[in-house]
Amino acid sequence: MTTTLHVRFSELDPYGHVNHAVHLQYFEQGRIEALAALGFGLLALQQRGFHLVVVEVHVRYLGPVAADDELDVVSAVHEVRPASARWRQQLRRGGDALATAEVRTAVTDRDGHPARAPDDFLAALRRLTSDAV
């Protein structure tokens, strides 16, 4: 699943590049939009009594991102477990990879305790499974 984003001036560091921490927001937006496209927006998940939280992130920065860049965040699920998923994502500009991320998300109940994800949510995550990223 691909999400297109545009770099905003407020995301730049003093050197004119996107600050490294902003990449995490880009990857998060990619995951959020991928889930929403499958009918699992974050508010809908909350209303059903569970939350999706990030428990681990590894980012590799491959090239600079600058003002006015149009970026694609490509998101795929690499592994689905009953209470977690491992995502692989790429930040691209014109087909060139600028950063990669591997993110583990976990499901919790309203109180923050680990929980098994509903079967329809797990099925949706499996539809995002790909080795392409």
Regions found by a protein language model. Give the residues of each.
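HotDog/MaoC-like acyl-thioester-processing domains
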Residues: 1-3, 36, 61-67, 77-133
